[in-house]
Amino acid sequence: MENKYTHGVLFYHEHSGLKNINQGIGEVTTALSSICKHLSIQLSENEGDIIKYCQEIKTKNYAKDVDILFILGGDGTVNELINGVMSHDLQLPIGILPGGTFNDFTKTLNIAPNHKQASEQMISAQVGTYDVIKINNQYALNFVGLGLIVQNAENVQDGSKDIFGKLSYIGSTVKTLLNPTQFNYQLSIDDKTYSGETTMILTANGPFIGGSRIPLTDLSPQDGELNTFIFNEQSFSILNDIFKKRDSMNWNEITQGIEHIPGKKISLTTDPAMKVDIDGEISLETPIDIEVIPNAIQLLTVNDL
């Protein structure tokens, strides 16, 4: 087989979510080495290491011939690589190999949830171009959320049960599971303003959150637009069939309790200040400015058969 790439770098973290990370590395390198003449395996020991390595790759201090990046890990590890690539303007394709609890964006890329199968898919995967979310000075592939979604993430981090489980964030009758915190918000989306009281606001780039698909048929991470959802009712027992697919044109007509607003530039303030979940990482508080950066990143994508 002809090598597609000259020098690939595989990033991984010891706490990737795999039970045996060293075994996992061995399982994925068989396929990856078949498409790269040279494959470097790079451990990320501390948070921020991957961003530092991206800077070294940009300045050619890491190596002069790197032409593809791979990441084995969960959404948090992937998020760090996205931030490294975006902040250092690395115009390199990325292959994502699932290795954590949730890999929401790999579903969008049609990548198998098993890391070994995913590595084999990289052999024939094609490069696709995707939008990225910019939040203040950080970047994300998939979503930005606050309110109930943060409460859930903190539950999971504390080792408590994930109340959403495999249910959609937009489908759970969460009032019976958790007492959501109400907060006041002021939201500007493409110069239109919205305000009120809510328990959750979610801005999505990708169609999968928490392992399930948002039932909005035209939501795409390749359309140069973000989709913001405001949960207006305290109890989200909102639909005859929450999983019934709908598009942007009729969402607000048939979906009670969740307002959908598409847009490109978003400013959000809250009272009180609220923690913000960015692709599963809680690292900011409101106020925040959000914008879409179209066609910003190259990701290996498996053709949907």
From Swiss-Prot:
Record's cofactor remark: Binds 1 Mg(2+) ion per subunit. This ion appears to have a structural role and is required for catalytic activity.
DAGKc domain sequence ranges: 3-139
One GO term of the biological process aspect: phospholipid biosynthetic process
Entry EC number(s): 2.7.1.-
Family annotation (SMART domains): DAGKc
Function in brief: May catalyze the ATP-dependent phosphorylation of lipids other than diacylglycerol (DAG).
Named cofactor requirement(s): Mg(2+)
Name of protein: Putative lipid kinase SaurJH9_0749
UniProt entry keywords in alphabetical sequence: ATP-binding, Kinase, Lipid biosynthesis, Lipid metabolism, Magnesium, Metal-binding, Nucleotide-binding, Phospholipid biosynthesis, Phospholipid metabolism, Transferase
Matching Pfam families: DAGK_cat, YegS_C
Organism: Staphylococcus aureus (strain JH9)
SUPFAM superfamilies according to UniProt: NAD kinase/diacylglycerol kinase-like
Enzyme class: transferase
Chain positions recorded as Mg(2+) binding sites: S220, D223, E225
Record-linked InterPro entries: ATP-NAD_kinase_N, Diacylglycerol/lipid_kinase, Diacylglycerol_kinase_cat_dom, Lipid_Phosphate_FormReg, NAD/diacylglycerol_kinase_sf, YegS/DAGK_C
A GO molecular-function descriptor: ATP-dependent diacylglycerol kinase activity
A GO term from the CC aspect: plasma membrane
Similarity comment text for this entry: Belongs to the diacylglycerol/lipid kinase family.
PANTHER family with a match to the protein in the record: LIPID KINASE YEGS, SPHINGOSINE KINASE
Binding site for ATP: S44, G74, D75, G76, T77, V78, N79, E80, T101
Active site feature: E281 (proton acceptor)
Species classification: Bacteria, Bacillati, Bacillota, Bacilli, Bacillales
Superkingdom of the source species: Bacteria
